[in-house]
Design a protein with these regions (language model features):
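Short, Lys/Arg-rich N-terminal segment immediately upstream of the first membrane anchor
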Residues: 1-5
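Hydrophobic membrane-insertion alpha-helices, especially the h-region
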Residues: 6-24
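Aromatic-capped interface at the extracytoplasmic side
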Residues: 19-40
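Ordered hydrophobic segments in well-structured contexts
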Residues: 36, 63-65, 127-131
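N-terminal secretory signal peptides
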Residues: 39-65
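Short, structured beta-strand-loop surface elements
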Residues: 42-49, 69-136
Length: 136
Protein backbone atom coordinates (compact mmCIF):
# COMPACT_ATOMS: atom_id res chain seq x y z
CA UNK A 1 0.00 0.00 0.00
CA UNK A 2 2.81 2.39 0.90
CA UNK A 3 4.62 1.58 -2.33
CA UNK A 4 1.46 2.18 -4.40
CA UNK A 5 0.96 5.57 -2.75
CA UNK A 6 4.56 6.46 -3.49
CA UNK A 7 4.19 5.51 -7.19
CA UNK A 8 0.93 7.45 -7.48
CA UNK A 9 2.57 10.48 -5.87
CA UNK A 10 5.52 10.31 -8.25
CA UNK A 11 3.21 9.85 -11.27
CA UNK A 12 1.13 12.84 -10.18
CA UNK A 13 4.27 14.94 -9.68
CA UNK A 14 5.52 14.00 -13.16
CA UNK A 15 2.11 14.89 -14.64
CA UNK A 16 2.16 18.31 -12.93
CA UNK A 17 5.69 18.83 -14.30
CA UNK A 18 4.53 18.00 -17.85
CA UNK A 19 1.60 20.45 -17.57
CA UNK A 20 3.87 23.23 -16.25
CA UNK A 21 6.43 22.55 -19.00
CA UNK A 22 3.80 22.48 -21.78
CA UNK A 23 2.09 25.67 -20.58
CA UNK A 24 5.44 27.43 -20.12
CA UNK A 25 6.64 26.51 -23.61
CA UNK A 26 3.39 27.70 -25.21
CA UNK A 27 3.62 30.99 -23.30
CA UNK A 28 7.29 31.48 -24.14
CA UNK A 29 7.26 30.58 -27.84
CA UNK A 30 3.69 31.77 -28.61
CA UNK A 31 3.38 29.71 -31.83
CA UNK A 32 1.70 31.53 -34.73
CA UNK A 33 -0.12 30.21 -37.77
CA UNK A 34 -3.03 31.16 -40.05
CA UNK A 35 -5.54 30.36 -37.27
CA UNK A 36 -4.03 32.68 -34.65
CA UNK A 37 -4.31 36.37 -33.88
CA UNK A 38 -2.23 38.86 -31.97
CA UNK A 39 -4.16 40.39 -29.09
CA UNK A 40 -2.65 43.49 -27.51
CA UNK A 41 -3.90 44.24 -24.00
CA UNK A 42 -3.05 47.42 -22.08
CA UNK A 43 -2.22 47.51 -18.41
CA UNK A 44 -2.81 50.67 -16.42
CA UNK A 45 -0.21 53.13 -17.59
CA UNK A 46 -0.79 51.92 -21.16
CA UNK A 47 1.91 49.25 -21.13
CA UNK A 48 1.03 47.03 -24.12
CA UNK A 49 1.37 43.25 -23.90
CA UNK A 50 0.89 41.11 -27.00
CA UNK A 51 -0.43 37.54 -26.73
CA UNK A 52 -0.77 35.11 -29.60
CA UNK A 53 -4.09 33.26 -29.30
CA UNK A 54 -6.18 30.90 -31.38
CA UNK A 55 -8.81 32.77 -33.36
CA UNK A 56 -12.39 31.53 -33.15
CA UNK A 57 -14.79 32.83 -35.78
CA UNK A 58 -18.32 31.79 -34.92
CA UNK A 59 -21.61 33.11 -36.29
CA UNK A 60 -20.07 36.33 -37.63
CA UNK A 61 -18.36 37.07 -34.31
CA UNK A 62 -14.70 36.89 -33.35
CA UNK A 63 -13.70 35.17 -30.11
CA UNK A 64 -10.66 33.98 -28.23
CA UNK A 65 -10.71 31.23 -25.63
CA UNK A 66 -9.21 31.45 -22.18
CA UNK A 67 -8.22 27.82 -21.77
CA UNK A 68 -4.70 27.78 -20.33
CA UNK A 69 -3.57 28.35 -16.76
CA UNK A 70 -1.30 31.34 -17.49
CA UNK A 71 -3.91 34.03 -18.03
CA UNK A 72 -2.51 37.35 -16.84
CA UNK A 73 -3.63 38.82 -20.18
CA UNK A 74 -7.22 37.83 -19.32
CA UNK A 75 -7.09 39.56 -15.93
CA UNK A 76 -5.62 42.64 -17.64
CA UNK A 77 -8.43 42.84 -20.20
CA UNK A 78 -11.02 42.48 -17.45
CA UNK A 79 -9.59 45.69 -15.96
CA UNK A 80 -9.24 47.39 -19.35
CA UNK A 81 -11.35 45.80 -22.13
CA UNK A 82 -9.91 48.04 -24.88
CA UNK A 83 -7.64 45.81 -26.98
CA UNK A 84 -5.95 45.74 -30.39
CA UNK A 85 -6.49 42.74 -32.68
CA UNK A 86 -4.27 41.78 -35.63
CA UNK A 87 -4.44 38.80 -37.97
CA UNK A 88 -3.85 38.40 -41.68
CA UNK A 89 -4.29 41.85 -43.23
CA UNK A 90 -6.64 43.00 -40.45
CA UNK A 91 -5.61 45.28 -37.60
CA UNK A 92 -8.25 47.05 -35.51
CA UNK A 93 -9.24 48.26 -32.07
CA UNK A 94 -11.84 46.23 -30.21
CA UNK A 95 -13.65 45.87 -26.93
CA UNK A 96 -13.23 42.50 -25.21
CA UNK A 97 -16.36 41.12 -23.56
CA UNK A 98 -16.51 37.95 -21.46
CA UNK A 99 -19.21 35.65 -22.85
CA UNK A 100 -21.65 34.82 -20.06
CA UNK A 101 -24.72 33.61 -21.96
CA UNK A 102 -24.86 29.79 -21.49
CA UNK A 103 -26.41 29.28 -24.96
CA UNK A 104 -23.64 31.24 -26.65
CA UNK A 105 -20.98 29.36 -24.67
CA UNK A 106 -22.56 26.00 -25.54
CA UNK A 107 -22.77 26.94 -29.21
CA UNK A 108 -19.09 27.89 -29.36
CA UNK A 109 -18.02 24.77 -27.44
CA UNK A 110 -20.03 22.59 -29.81
CA UNK A 111 -18.41 24.29 -32.80
CA UNK A 112 -14.88 24.31 -31.31
CA UNK A 113 -14.50 21.43 -28.84
CA UNK A 114 -11.18 20.69 -27.17
CA UNK A 115 -9.66 17.25 -27.59
CA UNK A 116 -9.09 15.09 -24.51
CA UNK A 117 -5.31 15.09 -25.03
CA UNK A 118 -5.18 18.91 -25.15
CA UNK A 119 -7.17 19.13 -21.93
CA UNK A 120 -4.85 16.52 -20.38
CA UNK A 121 -1.71 18.44 -21.44
CA UNK A 122 -3.08 21.71 -20.08
CA UNK A 123 -4.20 20.31 -16.73
CA UNK A 124 -7.96 20.63 -17.33
CA UNK A 125 -8.24 24.40 -16.83
CA UNK A 126 -11.67 26.06 -16.90
CA UNK A 127 -12.55 27.43 -20.35
CA UNK A 128 -13.99 30.89 -20.92
CA UNK A 129 -14.68 32.78 -24.14
CA UNK A 130 -14.09 36.44 -24.89
CA UNK A 131 -15.92 38.15 -27.75
CA UNK A 132 -13.86 40.80 -29.57
CA UNK A 133 -16.22 43.53 -30.74
CA UNK A 134 -14.65 45.99 -33.23
CA UNK A 135 -14.57 49.58 -31.97
CA UNK A 136 -16.21 52.24 -34.11
Amino acid sequence: MKRTSKYLGVAFGVYIGVVVLFESLIGYFQPQNAATLALTVYESGEQPHVRILSRIEHRDNLYVAVNHWPRAWFRTLQDNPSVRVAYGERDFGATARLVEDPREISSIETDRPLTWWFRLLTGYPPRYFVRLEPSN
